[in-house]
Amino acid sequence: MNEQYSAMRSNVSMLGKLLGDTIKDALGENILDRVETIRKLSKSSRAGNDAHRQELLSTLQNLSNDELLPVARAFSQFLNLTNVAEQYHTISPNGEGAKNPELLLQTFQRLKQQPNLTEAAVCEALGSLSLELVLTAHPTEITRRTLIHKLVEVNSCLKQLDHNDLSDYEHAQIMRRLRQLVAQAWHTDEIRKYRPSPVDEAKWGFAVVENSLWEGVPQFLRELNEQVEAAFGYTLPVDFVPVQFTSWMGGDRDGNPNVTADITRHVLQLSRWKATDLFLRDIAVLISELSMSECTPEVRELCGNPEALEPYREIMKNLRSQLMSTQAYLAGRLKGERLTRPANLLIANEQLWEPLYTCYQSLQACGMGIIANGQLLDTLRRVKCFGVPLVRIDIRQESTRHTEAIAEITRYLGLGDYESWSEADKQAFLIRELNSKRPLTPRQWEPSADTKEVLDTCRVAAEAPKGSIAAYVISMAKTPSDVLAVHLLLKEAGIDYAMPVAPLFETLDDLNNANGVMSQLLNIDWYRGLIQGKQMVMIGYSDSAKDAGVMAASWAQYQAQDALIKTCEKAGITLTLFHGRGGSIGRGGAPAHAALLSQPPGSLKGGLRVTEQGEMIRFKYGLPEVTISSLSLYTGAILEANLLPPPEPKTEWIGIMERLSAVSCKMYRGYVREHAEFVPYFRSATPEQELAKLPLGSRPAKRRPTGGVESLRAIPWIFAWTQNRLMLPAWLGAGAALQQVMEDGHQDQLEAMCRDWPFFSTRLGMLEMVFSKADLWLAEYYDQRLVDKSLWPLGKQLRDQLESDIKAVLTIANDAHLMADQPWIAESIALRNVYTDPLNVLQAELLHRSRQQEKAGGEPDARVEQALMVTIAGVAAGMRNTG
């Protein structure tokens, strides 16, 4: 571990020096000296020197408006470079992530040694493995795409420098390139000028596929196959591709008026166009490689020329022309041209798979397996993973939009107001219409704009090639009729197959009622016939945590999942739980392995479907090597959770969790909902109002333009508290509940739960992570600089609570300090703090200046505004998450 720290620190130090040289060249020695002084004061302040802490505050408070931006940019860019160095070291030869494929082999060996597990059972579990990662734009990823490309190349240079056999000339060339990249990054504006459109967000997702996943997935499957062969002597079938990628970019219209039916249609076409582009590159390589003449009769027949000397090349050239004609058609459609569909248009994966697989089988049969298992196998696996759609999309819409659409139809037909009907009457009407052969909507009817948009979206889903839409997700689902309503609207649009429709249960009450809703649905014969033994349910993490606090929310999520698993098992239904986790702890984020093993037994039998959000996509899938590491981690955790499920919790533990949940929820809501001073304190102690100015994503920050905390989306709510380092949503109520239960005499049981129950130990681990990133003196400084003195007592109360919560968690975990069992993460946080602290202090100063200017009725100072945006991006980089 120490070797890794020193290697990482030396890279961080080298990149820091290159950045310093760049700043000196660009702005002169004086600015660099100022930055260096601030860095040294910050380091000394972190080491406990109070005099230097005061000097740090005074230096940053006294910066002129002209100095603000260069200083903010220096520390923000340094944190971006630190993140690159850390990401590289997770996959470097002596890094943590590089060991993940080996960890997979260790998992296989551990499973083999279990007395009650046969090798056949392990191979069967492996064969049914299913992992679907849903990329979402919520864009907490605030780094511009142009900067990301430069940072990826920095990573590549670090990798080259690790080679031991470099000549002096080669070393000098790599260092020269690094200097160029650091200079390019410095001279590039890191803040977007405009909010991205939903199409921009989708393009960002396609860039992740092109730059990382396209290479990473086949490489991961090669490594997986090698590990399985080493452990069991078993070769994975060619069509075994347990990983799929779906996207919400261009499909998630919940609270986002910018995502329309036309946008979804455009993104679907753009995605298919990008797929043709990437497959054309693969086919070009295969045309070059597959020059052999010996083949099976099937290949001869497929190539259409019995005399062909190079039959494989003929087939590849035919595929190339089919891809090119499809690409040209899609390019025309994207420009709005009305075109006749070409006869050979690619709309289904089988059109690519069958010719490629025929060639694969022929090469194997003719003794050329070594060639078959090269580029051709990689392309076959890409067809299975990405295929013609490239990334499938989910459509997500709020339940009330469907209710309002159907109510408009029933009123027009003279049937009354659907919205005012009882749940039983709604269900009876919906089932009657679902069984009816006539259309629901009359031809001459003109719907309102809102209803037309809902119906048009369903039509887009019906027009899309089958398999392009992965699921229809209903946010704020509360009743069986919410699910039946969507099935009726999809039927009306012309969908003649059972598209997965997933209710999303996201508030505390909805999670508690989830099992009742699904039980009622599964008791409807028509519904059971439709779903053919498969059901997807989405569990919301972020909104439930905002509603009730993390402790109560995580317990409600656990119980909802447990009840749904048992209900579906009893009904003979395969349940896929879709986890709507965020990157931050307050939105359900946790290290993948720990998070999966802490779920209820049986929760992964139907596979894992999970959202990957914003900046976490770049951290986990930004490079092919990182992709391999992340997918290996998920694979091992799913297998382990399915074959060695955690024990059912003891009855007394459930009782303790009920108590913890009740106490924590009461305290959390006592502050957030009921304390008269809480909202004014939140608005002044955090940059919540200023965040709205940041061009973060296509979706508005609030569900309603007016309103308090409850109307704020979960992401800006978390983001704001992350910025001022109080991290409040990720801990409020949890530690106090633990303290209360200890005082009730249950410390021994809490320690046993921490030791023997993965669900509980993961909760505590997540709290420790948050506490490590929180900072009392910085949170206090924000109060002193920004908050009215009348609200200071509330701030002090919250900080005292945080301090007491930290002690409670350390007592139960029997640790002297935070993150004792994860020194690598503790080291990473410590390394960043030296650079994040000045950004936090500077941010408080900038907020102060900006608000004073506003109060005086003056025009905002562009230098202050720009520097403020840079500090927000910089702190996000330092915390390694936004919302």
From Swiss-Prot:
This is Phosphoenolpyruvate carboxylase. HAMAP family: PEPcase_type1 (MF_00595). The lineage of its organism: Bacteria, Pseudomonadati, Pseudomonadota, Gammaproteobacteria, Enterobacterales. InterPro entries: PEP_COase (IPR021135), PEP_COase_bac/pln-type (IPR022805), PEP_COase_Lys_AS (IPR018129), PEPCASE_His_AS (IPR033129), Pyrv/PenolPyrv_kinase-like_dom (IPR015813). SUPFAM superfamilies: Phosphoenolpyruvate/pyruvate domain (SSF51621). Pfam families: PEPcase. GO terms for molecular function: magnesium ion binding; phosphoenolpyruvate carboxylase activity. Belongs to the PEPCase type 1 family. PANTHER family: PHOSPHOENOLPYRUVATE CARBOXYLASE. Its cofactor is Mg(2+). GO terms for cellular component: cytosol. Forms oxaloacetate, a four-carbon dicarboxylic acid source for the tricarboxylic acid cycle. Its EC number is 4.1.1.31. It comes from the Bacteria. It catalyses: oxaloacetate + phosphate = phosphoenolpyruvate + hydrogencarbonate. It comes from Erwinia tasmaniensis (strain DSM 17950 / CFBP 7177 / CIP 109463 / NCPPB 4357 / Et1/99). Keywords: Carbon dioxide fixation, Lyase, Magnesium. The keyword Lyase applies. PROSITE patterns: PEPCASE_1 (PS00781), PEPCASE_2 (PS00393). GO terms for biological process: carbon fixation; oxaloacetate metabolic process; tricarboxylic acid cycle. The active site is at H138, K546.
